[in-house]
Each structure stands twice: as C-alpha cells, then as structure tokens.
C-alpha cells in the first residue's frame, strides 16, 4: 500500500503499520513516544476485548486515567507549589509596593522570603515541563489513530476518529475546562486573580471552539483528563487546608 495522508498528515500508513510524519532527528525521540502512546491505546482496547466489551471509547478513558495516575506525583508537586505562590501574593504585593523604586532590593527581599518559607517559585514549572511531552504525544497519537471501523463508534458518536456531529463533546470540553479554571483560580489575589479571571473566560471558549473539529476520541481524552484532575485537586486542596 502506498503512503497516504491520514488525519492532517500527522501519521502515514504503510501496509498495516503506521509511522509519524514528523521529520528531523530532533523529533525522533518524540516520534517514539507518540508510537508508544498509540501502542498503549491498542493495549487498552485489547483489554476491553478480553472482558467481552470491545470499545475504543472505554480504551481511551482507561488510558487517560492510567496516564494521569502515573503523572500524579508530578501534578501534586505542581499544585502544591502553585498554591504556595498564591498564598504569598499579598506579601509579594507589599514588597513590590515598598521597593518599587529599588528593583534590586525588591528581588533580594523576595529571595529572602522564599528562602525563609521554603518556597521555590520555579518548583511548579519543572513538573509541568516533564508532563508536556506525554500530553502532546497522546494528542498526536489520538489525532490520527487508525480505529477498527467495527468498533470506532461510542455512545452517540458514530466515529471516534471524526468530530462530534451533535456538538455535545465540544460543550462538555468547554464546561470541564471552565470548572477546572475556576478551581485552579481559587485563592488567587491581585494581578494573579485578574489574569486567572481572563483565562477562566478565554480558555473554555477556545477549547470548546477547537473541539468542534477535533476527533471525538481526542476530545474524550481532554474531558476525562479534566474530570480526573478536578477530583485530584479537590483532595489535594482539602489536604492542604487540613494541614494549616
């Protein structure tokens, strides 16, 4: 079989094998990661077959929960760091106002405050950077996954490889993103609160809009991921409040 475009040329077909269309040596490791994610989708589907309920939709849900559970320690670290920085916002604002004409002194005072309280302002970035390759890889993996036509339907969806014709998933993706944004912004103050307010409006609209054309399987991944993280953050926040 000749190569042919498959879902926006992200993947190409050769016989029964699929390979990424991303080129360049720098992308080789990422391509392997995408291939690995696609293999996990297949394994998850095989698992649903073993229990007598073959479903790619359930396979995506299982894989999403698995990935989020594996990345949970990094997510917990990121959330704790983010909450710590939110709680420091009032003190940071005081220092900014007090030393607004002396940037060097302001930075020194902030560094001393971080050291005193054991807070690293960059601690929340590293976990996110580690997670991003996996999240992007599953995005590409689901974007062009070669579903078996006999099992690519799920619930009201005729095909997980196509956009939701009834627009239910885009609404759910926007709603779940809005709930996540509201939860994440709890406790923010000052400029951070204003930025979070803007994101709470913009992100759900943006995610809902792009979900109109994304494959349903990919949108299901996004929704389940949001629901998992909402529950995860709820218990993390609850634990942090109990330890105060």
Residue map of PLM features:
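Low-complexity, intrinsically disordered or signal/transmembrane-proximal segments
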Residues: 6-7, 17
